């Protein structure tokens, strides 16, 4: 036992050497004092690493400082549960004398909705964490559900002075900006461990992996998230690489190490066994990602914990390979990825893990196991499905939240009550309220390809082509006796105009015009007018026929006679045109013929201009 203690001290020294330059970033949330006026303003507070911070949300409450038990290290005699209609109670406690988690647990049991712990010294804010491997605290830590935060000493004194002076102190805790939310995809990473014999924290981690697997795979398969697993490793100082402690806890000649699972170098599994399995799980993720099925990692780690536990002496390569094969992964590829743990060379996979432990930008170094990082910000709070899902969902840009983030278990749908105070058309069942993880957004909707325009709160009007398909464009419409009329003009505008035969504003009403009464039609002496909805019927007396365009009545026989004479004249004109055309053709042909005959006769007696004059040869005969 003495030897083990010495070894543990040496290994702790190795860890401290590797973490001596670590940069731990305290994750904060905004705290605003809304009253009294004299201390009104914004302040920083450090999010506690237990309980359930309301990531993506906020809480307004009344601050109460107990006169007795001001440190909250024992049960409270009075209740801090708020009355119906009153603001939630936020209990202010002093630091010291007991664990932070115990203070919050006692406050939760007394009915407080949140806890502020005032520091007892002037120093930069720190993160309130859970006790390490404390069996008694494990009983209540996992049951803490309220959020908590540490505040500076001077700010705490101001709050206490205001309360003791009789002022009502109201504050607003805001976690909406605790996680960046730049776009529609969340990048998150989990720093975990394959060791299942490291106590309470390992048990909590195993349960979390099982519970969160389903949600994680839905998010990953849908392309909503990009998940990366990580594993913390340390190195053994070069001077101790040949020591028993380094040989049992490290691979690759002291380059990559993990603590002994049972904290006993002489029994059970060694730390190097944990490092090898951690490496295998990293390679499972790498190979699965290459096949575009990165979510299979969740299946492997949960199956391995069930099928290959240390307690049953199955924490080995053979059991791991059986799990890998059952998931359809290539064992040879994974073995090749792992490399040789006994070689005196660097392992590229584990070297990347050591480099990744060092914080970059706003993210601090990873020093707590397990650690969840969402959009490059370290998560603070209970490692529980609902709490972690809230943190991840708060990383999506508004209105891009996947369905899993909008379930009743994760958030409250503010659109269900009075439509969130947004515009709505109950008739068409259309509303501007959009439920998001951070709360409702009033935004005019897009329905069936038609965009509504407006402020989203009081007005949303359809516009553009196709608008008449949506609740008739907000215009008047009616149907009677099989006839339908609409005041909507589908010309890309927003105008409503009563159709022909109606008058009105086109929006709320269009009244039928009585053309007969108003003498707008059917006014000829022989006409008989009867009004109809949206039009009129006009008939003529006797055998007369009504011509609507001329608003007149004519005789059917006269009409027929006119039609006959019209046909006669059409035929006659056609014949005349044919005869005239024929005569012109005949005349043209005769003239051509006569011209040719006359020219032929004249050509016999005299030369014509069109003929070439030939040479005149005279023959002289000489005797």
UniProtKB/Swiss-Prot annotation:
Compartments reported by the entry: Membrane; Golgi apparatus membrane; Cytoplasmic vesicle, Clathrin-coated vesicle membrane; Prevacuolar compartment membrane
PANTHER family per UniProt: PROTEASE-ASSOCIATED DOMAIN-CONTAINING PROTEIN, PROTEASE-ASSOCIATED DOMAIN-CONTAINING PROTEIN 1
Chain ranges on the Lumenal side, renumbered to this chain: 23-564
Highest taxon listed in the record's lineage: Eukaryota
Described function: Vacuolar-sorting receptor (VSR) involved in clathrin-coated vesicles sorting from Golgi apparatus to vacuoles. Seems to binds preferentially proteins containing a N-terminal NPIR motif.
Gene: BP80
Protein's name according to its UniProt entry: Vacuolar-sorting receptor 1
GO BP, sorted A to Z: protein transport
Organism lineage string: Eukaryota, Viridiplantae, Streptophyta, Embryophyta, Tracheophyta
Cellular component aspect of the GO annotation: clathrin-coated vesicle membrane; Golgi membrane
PROSITE patterns noted in UniProt: ASX_HYDROXYL, EGF_2, EGF_CA
Gene Ontology molecular function: calcium ion binding
InterPro entries per UniProt: cEGF, EGF-like_Ca-bd_dom, EGF-like_dom, EGF_Ca-bd_CS, PA_dom_sf, PA_domain, VSR_TRX
Domain notes: The tyrosine-based internalization signal may be involved in trafficking at the TGN.
């Amino acid at each position: 036992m003495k030897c083990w203690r010495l070894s543990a001290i040496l290994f702790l020294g190795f860890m401290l050497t590797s973490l001596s330059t670590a940069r731990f970033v305290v994750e904060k949330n905004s705290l605003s004092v809304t009253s009294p006026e004299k201390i009104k303003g914004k302040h920083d507070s450090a999010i506690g690493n237990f309980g359930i911070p309301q990531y993506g949300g906020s809480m307004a409450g009344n601050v109460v400082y107990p006169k007795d038990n001001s440190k909250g290290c024992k049960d409270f005699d009075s209740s801090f549960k708020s009355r119906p209609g009153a603001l939630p109670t936020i209990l202010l406690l002093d630091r010291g004398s007991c664990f932070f988690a115990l203070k919050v647990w006692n406050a939760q049991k007394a009915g407080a909705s949140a806890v502020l712990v005032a520091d007892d010294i002037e120093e930069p804010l720190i993160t309130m964490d859970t006790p390490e491997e404390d069996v008694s605290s494990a009983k209540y830590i996992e049951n803490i559900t309220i959020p908590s935060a540490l505040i500076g000493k001077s700010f705490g004194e101001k709050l206490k002075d205001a309360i003791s002076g009789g002022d009502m102190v109201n504050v607003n805790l805001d976690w909406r900006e605790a996680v960046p939310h730049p776009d529609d995809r969340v990048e998150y990473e989990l720093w975990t461990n394959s060791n299942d014999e490291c106590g309470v924290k390992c048990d909590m981690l195993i349960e979390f992996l099982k519970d969160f697997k389903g949600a994680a795979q839905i998010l990953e398969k849908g392309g909503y998230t990009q998940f990366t697993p990580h594993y913390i490793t340390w190195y053994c100082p070069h001077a101790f690489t040949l020591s028993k402690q380094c040989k049992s806890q490290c691979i690759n000649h002291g380059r990559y190490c993990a603590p002994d699972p049972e904290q006993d170098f002489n029994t059970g599994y060694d730390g190097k066994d944990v490092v090898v399995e951690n490496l295998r799980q990293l390679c499972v993720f790498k190979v699965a990602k290459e096949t575009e099925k990165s979510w299979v990692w969740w299946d492997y780690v949960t199956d391995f914990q069930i099928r290959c536990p240390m307690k049953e002496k199955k924490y080995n390569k053979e059991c791991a390979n059986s799990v890998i094969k059952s998931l359809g992964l290539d064992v040879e590829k994974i073995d090749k990825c792992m490399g040789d743990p006994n070689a005196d060379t660097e392992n590229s996979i584990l070297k990347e893990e050591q480099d990744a432990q060092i914080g970059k930008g706003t993210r601090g170094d990873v020093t707590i196991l397990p650690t969840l990082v969402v959009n490059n910000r370290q998560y603070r709070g209970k490692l529980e499905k609902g709490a972690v899902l809230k943190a991840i969902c708060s990383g999506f840009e508004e209105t891009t939240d996947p369905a899993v983030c909008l379930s009743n278990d994760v958030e409250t749908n503010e659109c269900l009550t009075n439509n969130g105070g947004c515009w709505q058309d109950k008739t068409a069942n259309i509303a501007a309220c959009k439920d998001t993880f951070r709360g409702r957004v009033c935004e005019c909707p897009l329905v069936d390809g038609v965009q509504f325009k407006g402020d989203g709160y009081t007005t949303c009007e359809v516009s553009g082509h196709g608008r008449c398909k949506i609740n008739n464009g907000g215009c008047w419409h009616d149907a009677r006796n099989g006839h339908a009329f609409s005041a909507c003009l589908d010309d890309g505008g927003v105008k409503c105009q009563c159709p022909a035969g109606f008058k009105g504003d086109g929006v709320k009403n269009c009244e039928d015009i009585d053309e007969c009464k108003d003498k707008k039609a059917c006014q000829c002496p022989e006409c008989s007018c009867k009004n109809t909805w949206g039009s009129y019927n006009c008939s003529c007396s006797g055998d007369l026929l009504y011509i609507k365009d001329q608003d007149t009545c004519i005789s059917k026989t006269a009409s027929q006679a006119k039609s006959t004479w019209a046909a006669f004249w059409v035929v006659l004109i056609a014949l005349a045109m044919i005869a005239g055309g024929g005569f012109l053709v005949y005349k043209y042909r005769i003239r051509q013929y006569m011209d040719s005959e006359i020219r032929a006769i004249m050509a016999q007696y005299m030369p014509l201009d069109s003929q070439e004059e030939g040479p005149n040869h005279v023959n002289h005969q000489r005797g």
